[in-house]
């Protein structure tokens, strides 16, 4: 099985404190979320965590878009 970077690690490459882009804002906020599942790759587990704990995420569609970018970058 090939090594795959965690979603969190990928998301951190999208940070940009000067950007108003939804994914950049998600990444900026996730950086400060001390309980974010940093080693997780699984969509369902990440989605459940975010739905229950990420008040900083304005819409799950932002996560969906970021996760698709993650998959595109892993292939």
Swiss-Prot record:
It comes from Lactobacillus johnsonii (strain CNCM I-12250 / La1 / NCC 533). This is UPF0346 protein LJ_1103. Belongs to the UPF0346 family. It comes from the Bacteria. The lineage of its organism: Bacteria, Bacillati, Bacillota, Bacilli, Lactobacillales. NCBIfam families: PRK13672.1 (NF010193).
């Amino acid at each position: 099985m090939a090594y795959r970077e965690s979603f969190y690690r990928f998301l951190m490459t999208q940070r940009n404190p000067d950007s108003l882009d939804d994914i950049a804002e998600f990444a900026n906020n996730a950086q400060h979320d001390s309980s974010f599942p940093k080693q997780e790759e699984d969509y369902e587990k990440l989605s459940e965590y975010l739905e229950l704990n990420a008040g900083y995420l304005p819409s799950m569609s932002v996560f969906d878009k970021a996760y698709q970018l993650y998959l595109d970058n892993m292939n």
